[in-house]
Amino acid sequence: MEAKRLLLLLLLCLYVVSSLVIASPQTCPADLSTKCADSGEWEGEFFPGIPTVKYEGPTSKNPLSFKWYNAQEEILGKKMKDWMRFSVAFWHTFRGSGADPFGSATKNWPWEDGTNSLAMAKRRMRANFEFIKKLGVDLWCFHDRDIAPDAETLEETNKNLDEVVALAKKLQGTKIHPLWGTAQLFLHPRYMHGAATSSEVGVYAYAAAQVKKAMEATHYLGGENYVFWGGREGYQTLLNTDMERELDHMARFLEAAVAYKKKIGFNGTLLIEPKPQEPTKHQYDWDAATSANFLRKYGLIDEFKLNIECNHATLSGHSCHHELETARISGLLGNIDANTGDPQVGWDTDQFLTDISEATMVMLSVVRNGGLAPGGFNFDAKLRRESTDVEDLFIAHISGMDTLARGLRNVAKLIEDGSLTDLVRKRYQSFDTEIGTKIEAGKADFEMLEKKAMEWGEPRVPSAKQELAEMIFQSAL
């Protein structure tokens, strides 16, 4: 009898313990010692111990706080959050593994199970929205194939995307939505010759079907923009390339996208993201000026704007500020992929921006543009391969947000001081004269200008005051 009582007591204890385990909230520990459950329906916490990130001011030593970005603070007539419109990039944040051409993955995130299953895609989506909410932003960006896996057929792949998009819609609620969506038209071997510029009509048609579906998903999720990045739209050698035909094909593809956008009632902005090379030797949307010329040639200039990525600017031999100004003065600045490159390497490193000087110049363009809405700042940036702690995801985004916030504060100083604006105004003040006004109005012919040149004699050419401009700029940093 004693043995039976002990057995019953043991069973009762096991029942109580198991009940407590079942009743307790699930969590996904932010360390490598524990993995999450396999179920795609798992709804526990992915970032336990990491609170919602708050503004604590520049004296704070807390790495999980904002020092310069204060979302509700008004600067130059707008709240900081409205100037910035920060967005999380799903691909770098939740698909970046740390792998590179010389090494395998280094980031063993605790929620990953090593598969590219639909269940895993749903779990990543849950992690994505917990991250977004704790970071305190309202926007995110995605490629179709990053959020949902490829299947054997296009129909099956579309079904996968539908399931994940339906979950994303539920998790978004009413506050969060995509800054932009796009189709991944570069990873699969079918796109090795390009997508819209492929030499194979079957690939062209497949790419069109993929963009059609991605545009529908973006629209359904309330996305404000749709991006075209032509990573394979270019060539490796001109010896086997009909450039004119490929450019015409790309234009027809974009025309079809414009038509479909209007057909489904998508009111968002279509964006082209320039990049000079990588993975192709030469991409057709080399830089902002090249992209603008393409749009003008094919009558698409009023249908698209540009998504400027700072690291792409440096690869094309320009500063980010140059590309932003080129886009802005053309009326084409629509969005910024906020990152930076390493000046000592020649490839796209996609680093988080931490240079205060560069951030200030970026924000000069944004303020001159009156903001970016309906665009914003997408953090197309990834952790370094050696950064492997879950909290590093937060630290990197916080640092990038604070850097751009400091840039905005510095621009406010420059505008309020007025010295730099005055220096530039004085440099061009000779064009504020009667003859200068006629030149700018297109009413001064060569005969008139020749007469003035003879009347005035040798012109006096004043100093450009570059060093003074640099001094004024640095004083605001």
Predicted regions and their residues:
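Active-site acidic/histidine proton-transfer and metal-coordination neighborhood
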Residues: G40, M125-A127, L139, P149-L306, ...
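Conserved, mostly hydrophobic/aromatic
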Residues: V88, I132, A207, T218, ...
